[in-house]
């Protein structure tokens, strides 16, 4: 002991190395307040560094107690050395402030005698000399408590130089209480406590009794002080330590911890420099012991030092290693501990409560962290879920003791899965912020979802994070330190703060992950509400799928005001809970949550959320879509983690409210795009339809007002998120979803979008007065003030919408005017009967009319950017809004805006390209837009495509420009797509022919963004068969219109070329005249389908894969372009299709989403980006998210459905053509992949597109060879599309389809569908393009598709459903079915891509059961899914068909399918295969 003490006091102190914390101690140079009591020699070092004024005296003085090394290190800063534990109060006792604090008097007597003979270390003379009052002006700073039990005798007399010092007389027994700075020690002599030069005393053997005299508290303090060398400033060092060592065996249960929190020095390797002292015998000690816990019962107490763990010496072992050793022991732990009993002074007791260890928070990061985490969580209101998980990980390993807390809270954990101790804190912590609340719930993994959503099937979602929560619980309990006594707790308070500090780091990181990606952190900052709202957009992406379930609810409960109110309020209130847990995961929960409060607003929000793992959850969603609302909590909690792991896009999505940021381009799209994106993007947008800040002008109704407010709030939040890349990727999807659910709001949004679009993009669209405008207005009214507001731009939006509509519907205006109430005047192309204005077909026709007019009037005139944005927005949103029920419009708008934003984004990134694309797009838009009349936002897609496919655009533009540009202005419709769409639009709008035209549009273009639920099928193939099917149903035409939108030129470049091929080959000669009408008839008869498919699917699909710009332009002019340059169009189309397939397969829906986005315009764009680059494709990402889960699945079904729409009017001729075209398209599509590639490279989404392109190319190589195969797929696609898209499906299943297809809503029957419709639309788009390549469609589907081609006209009415079912062979077999029918289709869609993709190729695998597939079949299948990149791994691992059904996520990851989208695509495709 003496030697230790000597070493301590001598220059060669046990702690020679400067402690890691020295710097810190040095820092407070002149502050006596926080001396590190435990600083020993090392601390001397510190002492110098942070010497108080008095300590500054002389280096010599300060050096007295410093080791030579220390002196060298801090020769001039003696203060550090004299740090005293507490503040020093002058006076006998006050001389040693720390003593006073500790109860120095009591120790005084005890410690007076122990003196250290420090004389040798410091020259008394020097010290004395150096000690001048000035030098030591005030109380010395106590560096650390002296080792208890040492006795010192004064060898030199000393007279106090400064107040607080004590006189020493030779021979006096001095009890050294603490080591201070400047060579001064604090001690008691003759009843006086104060400072004296260390040189004046020498150590003598101390009496054991003295050591023992000190209470354990004193010893602990001393030990801790020594150990921490200044870590524990607040503890006085008791002179005496009673050391008792004992070996205890701890046996705990699995669900509990050992009940102690371990703290200690952190070191990767044993700290050999550490010299155990009686006061600090080991590096690791028990910071806290849960009362009643395992450790407590075994006799362990706070402050015990760990000597051995499982019979291994850990005296010098670092914290992490010790924790790992404890963990390795499992539930059995043998600990040898040393209890250093410190003398307890009254002060000490207080101090003792929070033993120095707690104070050591900085030193012991892990243990400390757990507490600190807890404290921080509480303080910060951060979600404990993340922290808990982190903590659990850390603490569990670090300290099994903490586990004990869990054990104590083990019951709680079992009950709540939450630690009792932490439970409260986390709860309070969580509750403060939405994220916090979510965290708490997440932690619990129970209450959150349930409370959040009354009928919450979201429990499961919470369940996801439950494990995490539990962990957190343990951590929480640990944090709470249930075992800690009240006294200790007090002590813990400071540690808690420190812990908070420590925790904050872990917490933040932990928290952030759970809040998918970085969202949780961001959202919380905004505000629970904000966070929730934005979150909701993210969920909205999920919502895309959700909509299917919520369509009806959404419709009913979409009052804009209510919605926004609900969204904002609910989001804030419930969002907090769900957001984290369910946000990501449970589309349903969010829906439920939203529904109750404001079905629409909530829906939107949910939708955004839903996309998180669209693909993975597609199946789920399909079934749970109905009660999706049950999972409000999902908002953030569960998916957060999942998304990170699985769905970066989705995660982004969940978090993505920021994704909405991606939609930011909506700004450029002004009101409209903003609307569309806003809806998804901003709470306001989400809430109010498209109530972006600009759109928030929905003054007309309370709904509008409420939404406006909500939107603004959300906008702010979203703005905040926009800045976060993660959010960006999700934004589109969310937005889309958000728009979809509240049809009214969406419509408002739509209108504003359209209006905004018109204003911004098509200032020349003052055609508001046109009948088109009137219908829009009607829609606005329909929506109520909300819609008008959403249109927003106050009255402007409405007129804007009309305007946008007007220009677009210039020629179509008459048609429109006939249907101010809706596209009611439009005649069904097939049946010749008047279409319901809200019917998808009518909407599509209206959109097409608008597009035609627009193209005639001023597509060219529109600024490139405006044009892009506007067509996307207007066509997609505007037309669909007017034509389809408001819900459809809403959804379409949503999609449109997404698309449009995407377009804008592209614009900004690829201005040059965009402009060129714009020209092209103008042509395309004129064609497609005319055809679509901005139906269901396909135009939007178009527009988006143009900007997106900058390079492709150039590529295609050159071709298409040659081809399309001529048609562009005179008759965009004449183009392959325009023919179908443009001509059809004009025709359909004015007369029955129009309806067919529309149908054709749907069939040919499947461009009805809204109707897109049918997925603008793969351009040629899907188009052919699906077109027929689509023709069968009324709603098909609208989808066709969307098909126009489908024409997303850039994306269409490839897709349209395929369509063009179809059109060219098929309708090629029918008439791709510039005149819309002539084009339309041709389309309706022959090329309608091809055009529709090409335009819709190819464009839609291609755009996402490539640049949307190029594709979009090509897509719109696709028919013409295709005719002249089928190749180009096909390339786009192929890309689109492949992309969509690829996306589905590779990106789990991102790509698909991209396709889907294209249908909507935005949705399509969104889809694409998510797969490759979330940020890049923000819009797409947003959509992507929505599409991810819902869209993708829906997309398949919808996609399938969509192709049929293209051929509805001219099913017979068109289908035959389509079949041909499909093949060419397929070949071209596949063949054009390279071309597509270029487009893909262009634009902000170049990365995503490139990736998609590569996938497409791979797919193309395999599929292009087999046009038949492509046809095959299209058949499936067509079928799928047909069902959703068929008029009956559209109208009947409007809601249904909505669910499945985003645009289903547009067809308009149900507003709820709008929400879901949108995503489905996107999906359908994606699906369509997928279908075009028809990789997924099974041979049966292929046959079907091909077969239907000839009989489309007759089949149109009857076949749609059957085709869908047959084609899909997926869950969605009822085309006309209900939401679910569509949703199933949509859900199926999710698998559908798989099916589509499977059949896409003529490879053998398409003809045999999965379990009989050989390795090459599996490779071919992957290729068909655009996942050829994984072929080699699958082959290398000898994965054959028998393995596929058993592949788990982990297996896929092991096989290199790390992308959530790819994995989801594979899973979905597998599900489809197995369901077939």
Swiss-Prot record:
The modification Phosphothreonine is found at residues 485, 903. Residues 783-795 have a biased composition (Gly residues). GO terms for molecular function: ionotropic glutamate receptor binding; SH3 domain binding. Residues 1413-1476 form the SAM domain. Signal peptide: none annotated. CDD domains: PDZ_SHANK1_3-like, SAM_Shank1_2_3, SH3_Shank2. SUPFAM superfamilies: PDZ domain-like (SSF50156), SAM/Pointed domain (SSF47769), SH3-domain (SSF50044). Residues 247-341 form the PDZ domain. Gene3D superfamilies: 2.30.42.10, SH3 Domains, Transcription Factor, Ets-1. Keywords: Cell membrane, Cell projection, Cytoplasm, Glycoprotein, Membrane, Phosphoprotein, SH3 domain, SH3-binding, Synapse. The modification Phosphoserine is found at residues 456, 586, 724, 1334, 1338. The keyword Glycoprotein applies. InterPro entries: PDZ (IPR001478), PDZ_6 (IPR041489), PDZ_sf (IPR036034), SAM (IPR001660), SAM/pointed_sf (IPR013761), SH3-like_dom_sf (IPR036028), SH3_domain (IPR001452), SHANK (IPR051569). Residues 512-528, 1202-1212 have a biased composition (Pro residues). Pfam families: PDZ_6, SAM_1, SH3_2. Glycans are attached at residue 1292. Residues 666-678, 833-846, 1131-1151, 1291-1305, 1387-1401 have a biased composition (Low complexity). GO terms for biological process: adult behavior; exploration behavior; learning; long-term synaptic depression; long-term synaptic potentiation; memory; positive regulation of synaptic transmission, glutamatergic; social behavior. Belongs to the SHANK family. Is part of a complex with DLG4/PSD-95 and DLGAP1/GKAP. Interacts with CTTN/cortactin SH3 domain, DLGAP1/GKAP and alpha-latrotoxin receptor 1. Interacts with DNM2, DBNL, GRID2, BAIAP2, SLC9A3, PLCB3 and CFTR. Interacts (via proline-rich region) with PDE4D. Interacts with ABI1 (via SH3 domain). Seems to be an adapter protein in the postsynaptic density (PSD) of excitatory synapses that interconnects receptors of the postsynaptic membrane including NMDA-type and metabotropic glutamate receptors, and the actin-based cytoskeleton. May play a role in the structural and functional organization of the dendritic spine and synaptic junction. This is SH3 and multiple ankyrin repeat domains protein 2. It comes from Mus musculus.
């Amino acid at each position: 002991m003496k030697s230790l003490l000597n070493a301590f006091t001598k220059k060669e102190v046990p702690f020679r190395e400067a402690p890691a914390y020295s710097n810190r101690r040095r820092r407070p140079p002149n502050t006596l307040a926080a001396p590190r009591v435990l600083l020993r020699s090392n601390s001397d070092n510190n002492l110098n560094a942070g010497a108080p004024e008095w300590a500054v005296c002389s280096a010599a003085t300060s050096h007295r107690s410093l080791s030579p090394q220390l002196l060298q290190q801090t020769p001039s800063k003696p203060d550090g050395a004299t740090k005293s534990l507490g503040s020093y109060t002058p006076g006998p006792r006050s001389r040693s402030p720390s003593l006073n604090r500790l109860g120095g008097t009591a120790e005084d007597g005890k410690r007076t005698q122990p003196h250290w003979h420090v004389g040798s270390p410091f020259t008394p003379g020097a010290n004395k000399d150096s000690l001048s009052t000035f030098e030591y002006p005030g109380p010395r700073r106590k560096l650390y408590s002296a080792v208890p039990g040492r006795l010192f005798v004064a060898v030199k007399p000393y007279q106090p130089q400064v107040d607080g010092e004590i006189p020493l007389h030779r021979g006096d027994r001095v009890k050294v209480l603490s080591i201070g700075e400047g060579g001064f020690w604090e001690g008691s002599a003759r009843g006086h406590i104060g400072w004296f030069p260390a040189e004046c005393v020498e150590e003598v053997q101390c009496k054991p009794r003295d050591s023992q005299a000190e209470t354990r508290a004193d010893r602990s303090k001393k030990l801790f002080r020594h150990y921490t060398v200044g870590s524990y400033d607040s503890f006085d060092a008791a002179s005496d330590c009673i050391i008792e060592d004992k070996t205890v065996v701890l046996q705990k249960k699995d669900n509990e911890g050992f009940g102690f929190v371990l703290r200690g020095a952190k070191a990767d390797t044993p700290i050999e420099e550490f010299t155990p002292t009686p006061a600090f015998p080991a590096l690791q000690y028990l910071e806290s012991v849960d009362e009643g816990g395992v450790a407590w019962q075994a006799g362990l107490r706070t402050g015990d030092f760990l000597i051995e763990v499982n019979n291994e010496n850990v005296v010098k072992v670092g914290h992490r290693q010790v924790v790992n050793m404890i963990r390795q022991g499992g539930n059995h732990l043998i600990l040898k501990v040393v209890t250093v009993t410190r003398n307890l002074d009254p002060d000490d007791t207080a101090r003792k409560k929070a033993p120095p260890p707690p104070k050591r928070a900085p030193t012991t990061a892990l243990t400390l962290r757990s507490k600190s985490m807890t404290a921080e969580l509480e303080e910060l209101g951060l979600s404990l879920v993340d922290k808990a998980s982190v903590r659990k990980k850390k603490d569990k390993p670090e300290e099994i003791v903490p586990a004990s807390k869990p054990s104590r809270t083990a019951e709680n954990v079992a009950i709540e899965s939450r630690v009792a101790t932490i439970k409260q804190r986390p709860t309070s912590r969580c509750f403060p912020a939405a994220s916090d609340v979510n965290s708490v719930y997440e932690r619990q993994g129970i209450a959150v979802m349930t409370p959040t959503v009354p009928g919450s099937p979201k429990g499961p979602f919470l369940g996801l994070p439950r494990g995490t929560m539990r962990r957190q619980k343990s951590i929480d309990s640990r944090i709470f330190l249930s075992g800690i006594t009240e006294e200790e707790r007090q002590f813990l308070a400071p540690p808690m703060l420190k812990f908070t500090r420590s925790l904050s780091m872990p917490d933040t990181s932990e928290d952030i992950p759970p809040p998918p990606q970085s969202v949780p952190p961001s959202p919380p900052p905004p505000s629970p509400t904000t966070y929730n709202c934005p979150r909701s957009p993210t969920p909205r992406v999920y919502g895309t799928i959700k909509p299917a379930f919520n369509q009806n609810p959404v419709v009913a409960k979409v009052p804009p005001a209510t919605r926004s109110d609900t969204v904002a309020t609910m989001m804030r209130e419930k969002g907090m809970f769900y957001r984290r847990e369910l946000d990501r995961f449970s589309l349903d929960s969010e829906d439920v949550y939203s529904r109750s409060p404001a079905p629409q607003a909530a829906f939107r929000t949910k939708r955004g959320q839903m996309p998180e793992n669209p693909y993975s959850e597609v199946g789920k969603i399909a079934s749970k879509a109905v009660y999706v609302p049950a999972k409000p909590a999902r908002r953030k909690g569960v998916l957060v983690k999942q998304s990170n792991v699985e769905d970066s896009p989705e995660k982004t999505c969940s978090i993505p409210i920021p994704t909405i940021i991606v939609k930011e381009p909506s700004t450029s799209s002004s009101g409209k795009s903003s609307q569309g994106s806003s809806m998804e993007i901003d709470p306001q947008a989400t809430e109010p339809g498209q109530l972006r800040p600009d759109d928030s002008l929905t003054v007309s109704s309370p709904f509008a007002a409420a939404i406006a407010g909500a939107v603004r709030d959300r906008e702010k939040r979203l703005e905040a998120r926009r800045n976060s890349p993660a959010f960006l990727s999700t934004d589109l999807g969310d937005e889309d979803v958000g728009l979809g659910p509240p049809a009214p709001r969406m419509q408002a949004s739509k209108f504003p979008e359209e209006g905004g679009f018109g204003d911004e993009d098509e200032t020349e669209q003052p055609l508001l007065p046109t009948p088109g405008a009137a219908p829009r207005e009607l829609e606005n009214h329909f929506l109520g003030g909300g819609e008008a507001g959403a249109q927003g731009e106050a009255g402007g939006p409405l007129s804007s919408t009309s305007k946008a509509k007007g220009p677009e519907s210039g020629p179509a205006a008459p048609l429109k005017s006939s249907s101010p109430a809706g596209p009611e005047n439009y005649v069904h192309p097939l049946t010749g009967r008047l279409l319901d204005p809200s019917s998808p077909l009518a909407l599509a026709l209206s959109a097409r009319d608008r597009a035609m007019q627009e193209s005639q009037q001023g597509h060219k005139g529109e600024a490139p950017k405006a044009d892009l944005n506007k067509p996307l927005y207007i066509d997609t949103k505007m037309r669909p809004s007017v034509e389809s029920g408001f819900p459809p419009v809403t959804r379409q708008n949503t999609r449109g805006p997404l698309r449009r934003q995407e377009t804008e984004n592209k614009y900004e990134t690829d201005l040059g390209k965009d402009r060129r694309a714009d020209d092209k797009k103008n042509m395309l838009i004129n064609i497609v837009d005319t055809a679509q009349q901005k139906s269901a936002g396909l135009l939007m897609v178009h527009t988006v495509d143009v900007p997106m496919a900058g390079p492709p655009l150039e590529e295609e533009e050159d071709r298409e420009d040659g081809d399309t540009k001529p048609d562009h202005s005179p008759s965009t419709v004449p183009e392959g797509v325009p023919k179908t769409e443009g001509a059809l639009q004009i025709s359909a709008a004015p007369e029955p022919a129009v309806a067919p035209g529309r149908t054709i549009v749907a069939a040919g273009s499947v461009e009805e963004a809204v109707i897109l639920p049918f997925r603008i099928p793969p351009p040629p193939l899907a188009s052919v068969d699906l077109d027929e099917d689509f023709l069968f149903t009324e709603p098909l035409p609208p989808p066709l219109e969307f098909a126009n939108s489908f024409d997303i030129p850039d994306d269409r470049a490839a897709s349209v070329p395929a369509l063009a091929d179809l059109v060219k080959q098929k309708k090629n000669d029918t008439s791709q005249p510039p005149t819309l009408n002539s084009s339309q008839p041709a389309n309706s008869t022959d090329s309608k389908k091809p055009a529709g498919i090409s335009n819709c699917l190819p464009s839609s699909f291609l755009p996402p894969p490539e640049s949307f710009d190029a594709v979009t332009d090509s897509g719109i002019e696709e028919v013409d372009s295709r005719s002249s340059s089928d190749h180009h169009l096909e390339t786009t189309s192929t890309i689109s299709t492949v992309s969509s397939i690829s996306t589905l397969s590779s990106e789990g829906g991102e790509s698909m989403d991209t396709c889907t986005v294209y249908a909507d315009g935005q949705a399509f764009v969104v889809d694409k980006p998510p797969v490759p680059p979330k940020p890049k494709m923000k819009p797409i990402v947003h959509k992507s998210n929505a599409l991810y889960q819902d869209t993708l699945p829906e997309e398949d079904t919808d996609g399938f459905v969509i192709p049929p729409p293209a051929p509805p009017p001219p099913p017979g001729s068109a289908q035959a053509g389509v079949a041909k075209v499909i093949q060419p398209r397929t070949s071209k599509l596949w063949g054009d992949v390279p071309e597509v590639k270029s487009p893909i490279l262009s634009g902000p989404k170049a990365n995503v597109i490139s990736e998609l392109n590569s996938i497409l190319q791979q797919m193309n190589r395999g599929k292009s060879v087999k046009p038949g195969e492509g046809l095959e797929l299209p058949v499936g696609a067509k079928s799928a599309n047909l069902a959703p898209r068929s008029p009956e499906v559209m109208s009947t299943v409007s809601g249904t389809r909505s669910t499945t297809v985003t645009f289903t809503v547009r067809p308009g029957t149900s507003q709820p569908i709008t929400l879901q419709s949108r995503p489905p639309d996107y999906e359908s788009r994606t699906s369509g393009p997928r279908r075009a390549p028809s990789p997924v469609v099974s041979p049966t589907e292929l046959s079907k598709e091909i077969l239907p081609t000839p009989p489309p006209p007759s089949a149109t009415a009857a076949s749609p459903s059957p085709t869908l079912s047959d084609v899909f062979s997926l869950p969605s077999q009822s085309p006309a079915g209900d939401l679910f029918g569509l949703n199933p289709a949509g859900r199926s869609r999710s698998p559908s891509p798989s099916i589509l993709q499977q059949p896409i190729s003529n490879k053998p695998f398409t003809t045999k059961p999965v379990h009989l597939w050989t390795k090459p079949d599996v490779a071919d299948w992957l290729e068909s899914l655009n996942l050829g990149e994984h072929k080699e791994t699958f082959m290398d691992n000898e994965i054959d068909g028998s393995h596929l059904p058993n592949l788990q996520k982990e297996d896929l990851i092991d096989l290199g399918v790390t992308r959530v989208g790819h994995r989801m695509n594979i899973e979905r495709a597998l599900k489809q295969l197995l369901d077939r």
